[in-house]
Structures are given as structure tokens and as C-alpha cells.
């Protein structure tokens, strides 16, 4: 695609809303609260914020700067940074290709639950076998996934300004208002258990926020750092081509550093509010042992919590799943856009052709994922010890292998091959100040690659702490 014809976000607000929409996804809602509750509440939040300002800032800045400098999507951008590294673009582009089918499948699950709360099926949705019965059915999951994919495809088909930007500007403020509203309500509830124990939302807030360092070992602290880094890494949409694609649509006169700071604040605030919304509510009705992660939290634990609230729980549940739908679709739009922009730039296709090709691929991929829970069901032991089906295998490959690998290689490319000045010059091209320049240089050259390598080792089931302990025995 000709660079002169390339679409643009209209300004800073459009870019920030779109990038924040990508970053604020299911990971913020179903993983952040669980990790915060598991990892001593305030300890996890403190570590997460520190990493967001250092590690996350470095990776986010790198991806966005590469995109704006080259004015290309992920498939071709890295080759323009350094000819011998164009293969890295292909590696980065594979990530959204793997993610899109299973993300839209999960989006279909969210739509199913939202529909249940609007059609009077709230009692049924709390049943122990409801979720399993739905995902193992041969037709319903496909129908809901297709609806979700269609909505995603329409937004991407409409383009950057009239599609992605316009959509994000409308949905993101609504999403934030819903999260704030539900969070406030979560703090007001209380419940008396069968044993007479009274738990309140404020008690849950204390569990969420107050750090407890008592009895924490080096291993415990290390695992909190790994959990926080893993969550942040997946949350800000780096190393998967998305921020490179979005960066390529940013006008040259936009203050990149200011925009990146706003994206950081937005994503961290929403992640924090997600915890504020979920942890107190689950604690009130189920205690700390009621917290789980992933689909178990969203589709099993939370419906039971909403049901325990009584009639008001139906309203809260409906609002919650509307909010989750918005979060899921803004993220799926960004995943599809990373694929589409790559096709447009590499093969000089029109947006419409690229969007149609990507949608057709996603339909085939979704069928494979959905059938993985029934006619093609299997259980595979992963290197990290988890038992996986098709969706889990795709998630493991994209999130645990390819993304850390792409991020490590990006750090090597910028930190050692073309030097950090490449990114710094792009960020400061209009005379803007690079507020954390020295930090960025140290992080991209040394700290980030080491942390990412540890994250990658953990994905292969390698216990770094135990490994170091054995060395010094």
C-alpha cells in the first residue's frame, strides 16, 4: 500500500482510545483480579505499577515508534528498520493470526452470557453444568462466535477513522463508566454466611489493596514479579503486531510520548478497577477461596455471585457482560487489524479484500476451536504442566512462546542492532521531550530481555529459582 494513501487516526484522542481499547481486554477482567487476590493484594498491584512504568513503557514505546517511523504494519515494518530482520515481522504477524480465531470464540461465549441475562436465563446460567454444556455443544458456540466475528469484521472493514477510531471513541467511555459503576456497587454489598460470618465489600477491598509481606520468601516475591510481568506483557498488546499497526496510523505531528503515557494510565486504571469490581464481590459471597482465573472466574464464579445478590444481581450481571462484550470486541478489532494491515502492506491489497480474507480465515479457525470441545476433543500436557485442548494450545503458543520471543528479538534489534537512538529520534522528532530516555535505554538493552527470557523459561516449565538454588548447593 502506498504510504501517501495510508489512513490515519484523526489525532491523539482517537489513537489513545483505539490503543487503550486494544489493551483493555479479557486479560484485564478475568486474570488481573485473580492474580491480585492470589499474590497478596497490594504487593501485586505495587509490583504491577512499577513494571508498567518501566518494562511496559519500554515495550509499548518500541512497538509504537517502529510503526510510526515505518508507516507500515507488522509484516513489513521490521524489514524497513533493518533489511536482515524482516523475518521478525513475519514472526510478529503470526501472533494475531493464531489469536483471532480463539479470541472470537471466547467473544462468542461472552455474547451467550450477555444474552442469557437479557432473556431471563440468569438462574440457568448459574448452574454447574451450564458453561460446560454450552461450549461442548456443536452448534450454539459457532453461532455466537460468528456473530462476534461479524461485528469485529464490520468495524475493521470500515477503516481506521470511520471504523476503529469512531468505534473506540464511543465504546471506551461507556466501558469505563460501567466498570466504575459496578466497582462502586461492589463496595456497598455485604453478606452473612451460613456460619454467621459477615463479609462486606470493604473487607474485600482490604484483601485487594493491603499488602501482606509476612512470611514471603524470595521465591514468593519472584513469582509475584513473574505474574505481574506476564499480566502486563499480555495486557498492553505488545509483541503481537497490534501497536506497530496502530503506530503506523499515528500522524507525525502527534506527541508520541504524551500518547504513550495516556495509554499506560488508561490500561493500568482499568485493570485496577476490574480488580475493584470483582475481588470485593467474590470475597463477600465466596471468600478468598472463591477466586479463580480465566473462564472459570467469568462464566462460573461470577454468575453465582450475581445470583447470590438477588434481583439486583440480574441487573449487575447484565451490565457486567455488556462491559465485557465491549472490552472483548475492542481487543478483537485490534487483533484483526494487525493481520489486515500486514496483508495490505505486504501484498498491496485493498482494505476490503484484506478484511474479507482475514474473516474467512477466522471462520475456519473458529470452527476448529469450537470442535475442539466436542468432536475433536483431546487433552494434551503442555511444558508448563497445564492440560490443554485446541484453544489452550493456541493460547499457549501465542502468549507463552511467540510473544515473549518476538519481544526479546525486538529488544535485541532496537537495543543492539540499530541502537535505541532509532526509537528515541522518532519519539522526539518534533522536539518533544523523552521523559524516561535513560531508563528506556537500560531497559531495552539489558533489563527487558532478561525479564522476558525468564518469562519464556517459565513457559517451558523451567523453575528459575530452583535452578539458581541448585547451582549454589
Regions found by a protein language model. Name each.
Residues 88-91, 137, 347-359, 395-452:
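C-terminal membrane-solvent junction of multi-pass transporters and transport-like membrane proteins
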Residues 1-30, 59-64, 68-80, 86-87, ...:
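Membrane-interface "cap" regions at the ends of multi-pass membrane proteins
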Residues 8-19, 45-47, 84-97, 143-148, ...:
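Select transmembrane alpha-helical segments in multipass membrane proteins
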Residues 35, 39, 65, 80-81, ...:
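Membrane-water interface regions at transmembrane-helix termini and the short interhelical loops
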Residues 8, 14-15, 22, 138-143, ...:
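Loop-to-transmembrane helix boundary motifs in multi-pass membrane proteins
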Residues 3-6, 34-39, 72-91, 104-163, ...:
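Inter-helical loop and helix-membrane interface segments of multi-pass membrane transporters/permeases
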Residues 11-49, 241-242, 258-261, 265-268:
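Transmembrane helix-boundary motif of multi-pass solute transporters/channels
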Residues 2-9, 169-329, 333, 353-354, ...:
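Membrane-embedded translocation segments of transport machinery
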Amino acid at each position: 500500500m502506498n504510504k501517501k494513501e495510508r489512513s490515519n487516526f484523526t489525532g491523539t484522542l482517537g489513537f489513545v482510545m483505539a490503543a487503550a481499547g486494544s489493551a483493555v481486554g479479557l486479560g484485564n477482567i478475568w486474570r488481573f483480579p485473580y492474580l491480585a487476590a492470589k499474590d497478596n493484594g497490594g504487593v501485586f498491584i505495587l509490583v504491577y505499577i512499577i513494571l508498567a512504568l518501566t518494562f511496559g513503557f519500554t515495550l509499548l514505546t518500541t512497538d509504537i515508534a517502529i510503526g510510526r517511523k515505518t508507516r507500515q504494519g507488522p509484516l513489513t515494518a521490521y524489514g524497513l528498520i533493518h533489511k536482515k530482520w524482516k523475518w521478525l515481522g513475519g514472526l510478529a504477524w503470526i501472533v494475531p493470526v493464531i489469536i483471532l480465531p480463539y479470541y472470537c470464540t471466547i467473544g462468542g461465549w461472552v455474547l451467550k452470557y450477555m444474552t442469557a441475562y437479557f432473556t431471563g436465563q440468569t438462574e440457568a446460567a448459574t448452574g454447574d453444568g451450564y458453561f460446560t454444556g454450552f461450549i461442548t455443544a456443536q452448534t450454539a458456540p459457532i453461532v455466537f462466535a460468528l456473530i462476534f466475528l461479524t461485528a469485529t469484521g464490520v468495524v475493521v472493514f470500515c477503516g481506521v477513522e470511520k471504523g476503529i477510531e469512531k468505534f473506540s471513541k464511543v465504546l471506551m467511555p461507556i466501558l469505563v463508566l460501567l466498570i466504575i459503576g459496578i466497582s462502586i456497587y461492589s463496595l456497598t454489598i455485604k453478606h452473612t454466611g451460613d456460619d454467621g460470618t459477615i463479609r462486606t465489600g470493604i473487607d474485600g477491598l482490604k484483601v485487594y489493596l493491603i499488602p501482606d509481606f509476612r512470611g514471603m520468601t524470595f521465591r514468593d516475591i519472584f513469582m509475584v514479579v513473574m505474574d505481574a510481568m506476564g499480566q502486563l506483557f499480555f495486557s498492553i498488546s505488545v509483541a503481537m503486531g497490534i501497536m506497530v499497526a496502530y503506530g503506523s496510523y499515528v500522524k507525525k505531528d502527534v506527541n508520541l510520548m504524551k500518547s504513550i503515557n495516556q495509554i499506560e494510565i488508561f490500561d493500568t486504571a482499568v485493570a485496577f478497577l476490574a480488580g475493584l469490581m470483582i475481588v470485593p464481590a467474590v470475597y463477600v459471597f465466596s471468600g478468598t477461596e472463591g477466586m479463580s482465573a480465566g473462564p472459570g472466574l467469568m462464566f462460573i464464579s461470577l454468575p453465582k455471585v450475581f445470583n447470590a445478590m438477588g434481583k439486583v444481581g440480574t441487573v449487575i450481571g447484565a451490565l457486567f457482560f455488556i462491559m465485557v462484550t465491549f472490552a472483548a470486541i475492542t481487543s478483537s478489532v485490534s487483533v484483526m487489524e494487525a493481520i489486515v494491515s500486514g496483508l495490505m502492506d505486504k501484498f498491496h491489497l485493498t482494505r476490503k479484500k484484506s478484511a474479507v480474507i482475514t474473516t474467512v480465515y477466522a471462520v475456519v479457525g473458529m470452527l476448529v476451536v469450537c470442535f475442539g470441545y466436542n468432536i475433536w476433543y483431546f487433552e494434551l500436557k503442555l511444558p508448563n504442566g497445564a492440560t490443554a485442548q485446541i484453544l489452550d494450545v493456541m493460547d499457549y503458543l501465542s502468549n507463552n512462546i511467540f510473544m515473549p520471543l518476538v519481544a526479546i528479538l525486538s529488544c535485541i534489534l532496537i537495543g543492539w542492532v540499530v541502537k535505541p537512538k532509532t526509537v528515541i529520534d522518532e519519539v522526539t522528532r518534533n522536539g518533544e521531550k523523552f521523559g524516561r530516555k535513560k531508563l528506556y535505554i537500560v531497559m531495552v538493552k539489558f533489563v527487558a530481555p532478561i525479564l522476558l527470557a525468564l518469562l519464556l523459561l517459565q513457559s517451558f516449565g523451567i523453575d528459575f529459582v530452583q535452578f539458581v538454588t541448585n547451582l549454589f548447593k
